[in-house]
From Swiss-Prot:
One of its GO terms (molecular function) is ribonucleoside binding. Signal peptide: none annotated. The RNAP catalytic core consists of 2 alpha, 1 beta, 1 beta' and 1 omega subunit. When a sigma factor is associated with the core the holoenzyme is formed, which can initiate transcription. This is DNA-directed RNA polymerase subunit beta. The keyword Transferase applies. InterPro entries: DNA-dir_RNA_pol_bsu_ext_1_sf, DNA-dir_RNA_pol_bsu_external_1, DNA-dir_RNA_pol_su2, DNA-dir_RNAP_su2_dom, DNA-dir_RNAP_su2_hyb_sf, RNA_pol_bsu_bac, RNA_pol_bsu_CS, RNA_pol_bsu_protrusion. HAMAP family: RNApol_bact_RpoB. Keywords: DNA-directed RNA polymerase, Nucleotidyltransferase, Transcription, Transferase. Pfam families: RNA_pol_Rpb2_1, RNA_pol_Rpb2_2, RNA_pol_Rpb2_3, RNA_pol_Rpb2_45, RNA_pol_Rpb2_6, RNA_pol_Rpb2_7. DNA-dependent RNA polymerase catalyzes the transcription of DNA into RNA using the four ribonucleoside triphosphates as substrates. It comes from Corynebacterium urealyticum (strain ATCC 43042 / DSM 7109).
Length: 1170
C-alpha cells in the first residue's frame, strides 16, 4: 500500500565512484579513501524513513538487530508512549497502535500546481476497553493527511517546496561545571541534570562549602533535605557520604529531622504561599522526577547519564531518574570539588572525574527531521488526550466508540503549524543544485528549544576541536548567525541517539587496515588519531617512525607509529560539500574560503552549463545526490529522445519513460530545466546520467564558466574589486541566465458584485489589448514590458444616483454602461520578458480555491538576462566583484596568438586577502586548457622535483581536459611549477604562457606589448544572484504614505530615494536654500504644492511658491496630542490658521489633470498613480 511514497525515502547508493558514462577528470589526488562519501541526503531520508517506518528501513534495521528483536518506527514509539489513555477512575482506556499510510493523494507536480500538500492519509488502530463490562471495541481511525518527503528530501506544503533543517541542541544528560568565585577566587562546582522533558535538577557547592539543590530553577536548599525526602535516613546519608566533610556539614545544618519534614520543606520552596500536606508534597516530588508522563530523559539522556556516572544498565530501561542516579551524581560532585581525579561507580567501574565542556559535540546532538515531526505529533496527541479524557467522563459508557472519543483536529493542526510556521521548516533555497543540497545538510542551533541569536556568546559560535569531521569549520553565514548555523561535513553521519559520527581507519602496530569505524566525538577522544596524509608505503605501513597525531582536546603531538590507533579516511573529511568544491582550499585564508563556499550557493544556473577545468572531484557526487539529474535505474537502450521525455527499453524488455522538467520556476525565480544527454539508439548502463539538470554538465556540478583571466590593473576601471569583461560575454551569451517570474491575480466576490476577468476593459485602446485572447488573458509567447496588461480584470464601482441621460443609456445599451473600474494585472515597473505559461483555475472546473475567489490566473514570464554593468561575479575563493566596464573585444589585452582575454581582475585583490588559491587555479586552468606532456628524462630540477609526487597517469594529458585537485590533497607548488614547464605549445609551436604562468600580453587599443609579463589562465567564474536588474529603481510620481504624505520607500513599494538628515546638512552647508526648499516641500509632502507644480509643468507655466509640508502639520498634531498649545505665527507675528481649505482646490486640480496621488500604503494594494 505504501510502495509509492516510501520510494521517496529509499537509501541512495553509497558508491558512485564508477558512474558509467561520466567525464574523465585527471586527478592529482595521492590518497585513496577506503570508503565512498555516504549518501549526501541520508541525513533527511533516513530520519524520515525511521519516523514513518518505511519498508526498506525496517528490513535493514531488522537485519542489523537480528531476528526476534522488535524494530519500531518513530510514530509507533509515540503511540506506545501515549497509550493507554485512561479516564480519571481508570475504568475505561483507549489504546492507539499500528500507524499506517494509504496511497498518496496527489503527485508531486499536482501538489505544486494546485497549491496543496504532498501528503498521504495516516490511519491508526484505536482500541477502546471498558474494564467494568470487559467490552473491547476496535476501529481504524483516520488521523489526518501526513506530509510525505519527496525523493529529494523536501516537503511540498501549500504548493511550495520546503526543507526541514536539523537542529543542534544540548543533549539530555548530566553536566558538571566549574566557575571561579570572584571574592575568594576559589573554584566552585555545580551539576545540572537535564531531561528531554521535565524539571531540571541542579546541585552546587557554594563558597561556604555547603552542597545545595535547586529543583526546577526554584530556591536553593540543602541537598540533604532532598535525600531525606527520598526516604534516606541520617545514618544512610552518613554511610554513603561520610568521606566528605562538606556533605557532613550540610547534613548538620539542614534543619530537618525526617522524611515528612523534608517533603514539606521542599513543597514550601517549590510552591510558596500554598499550604503543604504530606501527600501533596510526596506527589509533587514523584511527579517532578519519577513519573514517565511528566519526566523523560529519553534514550539518549539515559545513555549519557549511564556513561558519565559509570552506571551499567540498558539504555532502553528507565527513562525517569532513579535514586541511584541522584546519589551517584552528588558523590561525583563532592569528589570533583575535593579535587579527586577518579572514583569507583556503584557498578564497580573506575570512572574519570572531570568537568564537561557544553560546546563539545559529545554533549550536543541533532534533532533531525523525523524527531522534530515526532515531537510535534506528540504535542498534538497530548492535546487530543485531554479531549479523550473529558469525553470519557461525559459520554454514556455503553455508546462510546473509539471514533466518538477521538478528535483528530489537534494532531493535524500541530503538524500543519510545524510545517507552515516553524523556524526550522524553511522555504527551500533552490538557487542551484548545490544550494538545495547544502540546505538539506544544514545544522541550525537556533529555533524552539535552541539558542537565540542575542544570547549566544562567542564560545558556542566558535570552531571546536570536536567539530572535526562532523561540522564544517568553514561554511557558516556571515553576520548575526555566524557559528550558529553550520553544515554537515562530507563523511559525517548521524547515529540513532542523534550524535554526529565520523569514520576512521583502524591502525594496528603501524599497519593500516581497511577496517573503518565510525566514532562520536566523545568516543574519538579516547584514541590517538593520525591525519589522512600521513605517508605510508605499498604494504600500508607508516614510512616514518614518529607520527603527527591528534589527541583529546585537539592537541597535536608526535608519537611513535606503534601508538597510533586510527587515521582519517580522507583529507576532505573535515569540510562540507560546498567547501570541498573549492580547489586549492589549503592556500586560502579561512574568511575568504567561507565567502567562497557561501557564494557558490548564490550562483545562478547559466544558459549553457560548463564544468570547471579545475575541479576537486566531488562535483559529480554532489550533482548525483542533489537529485536534479535523471539517472537510468536499469541498463537498456534509448528508444526515443525529445526535449520533453526519454524512453528506454531495459534489458528485461520493459519500457521506461522519463519526463523532463522544462523551464519551471524555482523558489528563487531561477529557471529549472533538464536537458537530455543521450541519443536515440545509445546503450545506457544502470546508474548512468541520461539528463542534466540546472547548473550541471554531463552529470557534474557546473555553476559557472571557465574564463580566460588576466591579473592586471586597467586604467583604474577595475579599482577596488571592479571587474572588466569582454563584450564576447554578452554577444555569445556566455554569462546569460534565464529568470522566471510568476504573477497571480484572482477574481473575487465583492460587496458590489463579482469581479470579472475579461477583455472588455473600460478606456483601453485595442493596441493595448493586442496580445490578450478572448478571455482577457495574455497569449503564450507574447513579449511584454512594464505596464502591459497580463490579465484584464474589472471590478464593480459603487453605484451612484444616475442622471436621466445615464438611465437612458442604460436602457438602450443594457449592462454595458454599468460602472466598473479597471483592476487588470499589469507587468510591474522595470520588468520585461516573454510569457511562457498561463494557468487558469476556476470554480466551474471544480478547482479548490480560497473562499470568495471565483477564478485565479497565473502567468509565468521568462527573462533572458545577459551580463551587464553592475552584476556581481565571483570565483570560488571569495574573490567577488561587480562588473565595472564591458569592453569591446578589440580593446581587451590579447595573447601573442591574437586571443583576447575574457576578464581582467585587479592584482590588488590577492595579497591582503590571502586567497592565493585563485592564482594557482588560474595556472592549473591554463594547463588543463593547453594540456601537458612531461619529459621523464629531463634534467630540469623543477621537473625532477615534480616527478617524485606526480601520479603516472598525469604524465601525458591532452588539451581541453578536466582536472581535479581535491582539498588538502591536490596539486602541489612543485607539481604546478614542473607542469608549466611541460605545457603543450599551440598550433604554431609557441608556448604562450612561460614557466612562471605569465604571458606577454598586448594592449588591444595600441597594439603595444605591456612592459611586464602578466599572469594569464582560466578561472571558474560564477554569476551571482545579485543582479542589477533587480536592484535598479527610479520613480517619477508614485504612492505616498497616508500619515506623513511623503513618498514610500523601497523598490517593492515603488518608493522614492530618502533625502535624509545628513543630506539636508550638506545642502545647508552649500547654502543651496531654494533646492532644499523644493526638496522638503513640493518634491515631498506639500500636498497642494506638488499638484500645482504638476499642473504648472503640464501647462508650461512658472513653478508656484511652495506651501507648508504635511509632516509639519503632523508634528503640530503630535504636540497638541501631548496637551501642548502650539501656535504657528506668520512673519508679522500674527497667528496662522493651518486649515484644510486647500482640499477643495486640490480635488479640482486633480480632476482637471486626471491624476490621483493618494494611495493605500500596503505593498499589496493596487498602485494608482498619476
Amino acid at each position: 500500500m505504501l510502495e509509492g511514497p516510501i520510494l521517496a525515502v529509499s537509501r541512495q547508493t553509497s558508491s558512485v565512484a564508477g558512474i558509467p558514462g561520466a567525464s574523465t577528470r585527471y586527478s592529482f589526488a595521492k590518497i585513496d579513501a577506503p570508503i565512498e562519501v555516504p549518501g549526501l541526503l541520508d541525513l533527511q531520508r533516513e530520519s524520515f524513513a525511521w519516523l514513518v517506518g518505511a519498508p526498506e528501513w525496517r528490513a535493514r534495521m531488522q537485519a542489523e538487530a537480528g531476528e526476534g528483536v522488535r524494530v519500531t518506527s518513530g510514530l509507533e514509539d509515540i503511540l506506545e508512549e501515549l497509550s493507554p489513555i485512561e479516564d480519571y477512575s481508570e475504568n475505561m482506556s483507549l489504546t492507539l497502535s499500528e500507524p499506517r499510510f494509504d496511497d498518496m493523494k496527489t503527485s508531486i507536480d499536482e501538489a505544486k500546481e494546485k497549491d496543496i500538500n504532498y501528503a498521504a492519509p495516516l490511519y491508526v488502530t484505536a482500541e477502546f476497553t471498558n474494564a467494568q463490562s470487559g467490552e473491547i471495541k476496535s476501529q481504524t481511525v483516520f488521523i489526518g493527511d501526513f506530509p510525505m518527503m519527496t525523493d529529494k528530501g523536501t516537503f511540498i506544503i501549500n504548493g511550495t517546496e520546503r526543507v526541514v533543517v536539523s537542529q543542534l541542541v544540548r543533549s539530555p544528560g548530566v553536566y558538571f561545571d566549574e566557575s571561579i568565585d570572584t571574592s575568594t577566587e576559589r573554584p566552585l562546582h555545580g551539576v545540572k541534570v537535564i531531561p528531554s522533558r521535565g524539571a531540571w535538577l541542579e546541585f552546587d557547592v557554594d563558597k561556604r562549602d555547603t552542597v545545595g539543590v535547586r529543583i526546577d530553577r526554584k530556591r536553593r536548599q540543602p541537598v540533604t533535605v532532598l535525600l531525606k525526602a527520598l526516604g534516606l535516613t541520617t545514618q544512610e546519608i552518613t554511610d554513603r557520604f561520610g568521606f566528605s566533610e562538606i556533605m557532613m556539614s550540610t547534613l548538620e545544618k539542614d534543619g530537618v529531622e525526617n522524611t515528612d519534614e523534608a517533603l514539606l520543606e521542599i513543597y514550601r520552596k517549590q510552591r510558596p504561599g500554598e499550604s503543604p500536606t504530606r501527600d501533596s508534597a510526596q506527589a509533587l516530588l514523584e511527579n517532578s522526577f519519577f513519573r514517565p508522563k511528566r519526566y523523560d530523559l529519553a534514550k539518549v539522556g539515559r545513555y549519557k547519564v549511564n556513561r558519565k556516572l559509570g552506571l551499567g544498565g540498558d539504555t532502553d530501561g528507565t527513562m525517569t531518574l532513579t535514586e541511584e542516579d541522584i546519589l551517584t551524581t552528588i558523590e561525583y560532585l563532592v569528589r570533583l570539588h575535593a579535587g579527586e581525579r577518579t572514583m569507583t561507580s556503584p557498578e564497580g567501574v573506575e570512572i574519570p572525574i572531570e568537568v564537561d565542556d557544553i560546546d563539545h559535540f559529545g554533549n550536543r546532538r541533532l534533532r533531525t527531521v523525523g524527531e522534530l515531526i515526532q515531537n510535534q505529533v506528540r504535542v498534538g496527541l497530548s492535546r487530543m488526550e485531554r479531549v479523550v479524557r473529558e469525553r470519557m467522563t461525559t459520554q454514556d459508557a455503553e455508546s462510546i466508540t473509539p471514533t466518538s472519543l477521538i478528535n483528530v483536529r489537534p494532531v493535524s493542526a500541530a503538524i500543519r503549524e510545524f510545517f507552515g510556521t516553524s523556524q526550522l521548516s524553511q522555504f527551500m533555497d533552490q538557487n542551484n543544485s548545490l544550494s538545495g543540497l547544502t540546505h538539506k545538510r544544514r545544522l541550525n542551533a537556533l529555533g524552539p528549544g535552541g539558542l537565540s541569536r542575542e544570547r549566544a556568546g562567542l564560545e558556542v559560535r566558535d570552531v571546536h576541536p570536536s567539530h572535526y569531521g562532523r561540522m564544517c569549520p568553514i561554511e557558516t553565514p556571515e553576520g548575526p548567525n555566524i557559528g550558529l548555523i553550520g553544515s554537515l561535513s562530507s563523511y559525517a553521519r548521524v547515529n540513532p541517539f542523534g550524535f554526529i559520527e565520523t569514520p576512521y581507519r583502524r591502525v594496528v602496530d603501524g599497519q593500516i587496515t581497511d577496517e573503518v569505524e565510525y566514532f562520536t566525538a566523545d568516543e574519538e577522544d579516547r584514541h590517538v588519531i593520525a591525519q589522512a596524509n600521513t605517508p605510508f608505503d605499498a604494504d600500508m605501513k607508516f614510512t616514518e617512525d614518529q607520527i603527527e597525531v591528534r589527541l583529546r582536546g585537539g592537541d597535536v603531538e608526535v608519537v611513535p607509529a606503534s601508538q597510533v590507533d586510527y587515521m582519517d579516511v580522507s583529507p576532505r573529511q573535515m569540510v562540507s560539500v560546498a567547501t570541498a568544491m573549492i580547489p586549492f582550499l589549503e592556500h586560502d585564508d579561512a574568511n575568504r574560503a567561507l565567502m567562497g563556499a557561501n557564494m557558490q550557493r548564490q550562483a545562478v544556473p547559466l544558459l549553457r552549463a560548463e564544468a570547471p577545468y579545475v575541479g576537486t572531484g566531488i562535483e559529480q557526487r554532489a550533482a548525483y545526490d542533489a537529485g536534479d539529474l535523471i539517472i537510468a535505474p536499469k541498463a537498456g537502450v534509448v528508444e526515443y529522445v525529445s526535449a520533453d521525455y526519454i524512453t528506454i527499453m531495459d534489458d528485461e524488455g520493459i519500457r521506461d519513460t522519463f519526463m523532463l522538467r522544462k523551464f519551471e520556476r524555482t523558489n528563487q525565480g531561477t529557471s529549472y530545466n533538464q536537458k537530455p544527454l543521450v541519443n536515440q539508439g545509445d546503450r545506457v548502463e544502470a546508474g548512468q546520467v541520461i539528463a542534466d539538470g540546472p547548473g550541471t554538465d554531463n552529470g557534474e556540478m557546473a555553476l559557472g564558466k571557465n574564463l580566460l583571466v588576466a591579473f592586471m590593473p586597467w586604467e583604474g576601471h577595475n579599482y577596488e574589486d571592479a571587474i572588466i569583461l569582454s563584450q564576447r560575454m554578452v554577444e555569445e551569451d556566455v554569462l546569460t541566465s534565464i529568470h522566471i517570474e510568476e504573477y497571480e491575480i484572482d477574481a473575487r466576490d465583492t460587496k458590489l458584485g463579482p469581479e470579472e476577468i475579461t477583455r472588455d476593459i473600460p478606456n483601453v485602446g485595442e493596441d493595448v489589448l493586442a496580445d490578450l485572447d478572448e478571455r482577457g488573458i495574455v497569449r503564450i509567447g507574447a513579449d511584454v514590458r512594464d505596464g502591459d496588461i497580463l490579465v484584464g480584470k474589472v471590478t464593480p464601482k459603487g453605484e451612484t444616483e444616475l442622471t436621466p441621460e445615464e438611465r437612458l443609456l442604460r436602457a438602450i445599451f443594457g449592462e454595458k454602461a454599468r460602472e466598473v473600474r479597471d483592476t487588470s494585472m499589469k507587468v510591474p515597473h522595470g520588468e520585461t520578458g516573454k510569457v511562457i505559461g498561463v494557468r487558469v483555475f476556476s470554480r466551474e472546473d471544480d478547482d479548490d480555491l480560497a473562499a470568495g475567489v471565483n477564478e485565479m490566473v497565473r502567468v509565468y514570464v521568462a527573462q533572458k538576462r545577459k551580463i551587464q554593468d553592475g552584476d556581481k561575479l565571483a570565483g570560488r575563493h571569495g574573490n567577488k566583484g561587480v562588473v565595472g566596464k564591458i569592453l569591446p573585444q578589440e580593446d581587451m589585452p590579447f595573447l601573442p596568438d591574437g586571443t583576447p582575454v575574457d576578464i581582467i581582475l585587479n592584482t590588488h585583490g590577492v595579497p591582503r586577502r590571502m586567497n592565493i588559491g585563485q592564482v594557482l587555479e588560474v595556472h592549473l586552468g591554463w594547463l588543463a586548457k593547453a594540456g601537458w606532456q612531461v619529459d621523464t628524462n629531463s634534467d630540469d630540477p623543477k621537473i625532477k622535483a615534480m616527478l617524485e609526487t606526480l601520479p603516472e597517469d598525469l604524465y601525458d594529458v591532452p588539451a581541453d581536459s578536466l582536472t581535479s585537485t581535491p582539498v588538502f590533497d591536490g596539486a602541489s607548488n612543485a607539481e604546478l611549477s614542473g607542469l608549466l614547464r611541460s605545457s603543450r605549445p599551440d598550433r604554431d609551436g609557441i608556448r604562450l604562457v612561460d614557466d612562471f604562468g605569465k604571458a606577454q600580453l598586448i594592449d588591444g587599443r595600441t597594439g603595444e606589448p605591456y612592459e611586464h609579463p602578466i599572469s594569464v589562465g582560466y578561472m571558474y567564474m560564477l554569476k551571482l544572484h545579485h543582479l542589477v536588474d533587480e536592484k535598479i529603481h527610479a520613480r517619477s510620481t508614485g504612492p505616498y504614505s497616508m500619515i506623513t504624505q511623503q513618498p514610500l520607500g523601497g523598490k517593492a513599494q515603488f518608493g522614492g530615494q530618502r533625502f535624509g538628515e545628513m543630506e539636508v546638512w550638506a545642502m545647508q552647508a552649500y547654502g543651496a536654500a531654494y533646492t532644499l526648499q523644493e526638496l522638503l516641500t513640493i518634491k515631498s509632502d506639500d500636498v497642494v504644492g506638488r499638484v500645482k507644480v504638476y499642473e504648472a509643468i503640464v501647462k508650461g507655466e512658472n513653478i508656484p511658491d511652495p506651501g507648508i509640508p504635511e509632516s509639519f502639520k503632523v508634528l503640530l498634531k503630535e504636540l497638541q496630542s501631548l496637551c501642548l498649545n502650539v501656535e504657528v505665527l506668520a512673519a508679522d507675528g500674527t497667528p496662522m490658521e493651518l486649515s484644510s481649505d486647500d482640499d477643495d482646490e486640490l480635488e479640482s486640480a486633480n480632476a482637471a489633470l486626471g491624476i490621483n496621488l493618494q494611495r493605500d500604503e500596503r505593498p499589496d494594494a493596487d498602485i494608482d498613480v498619476g
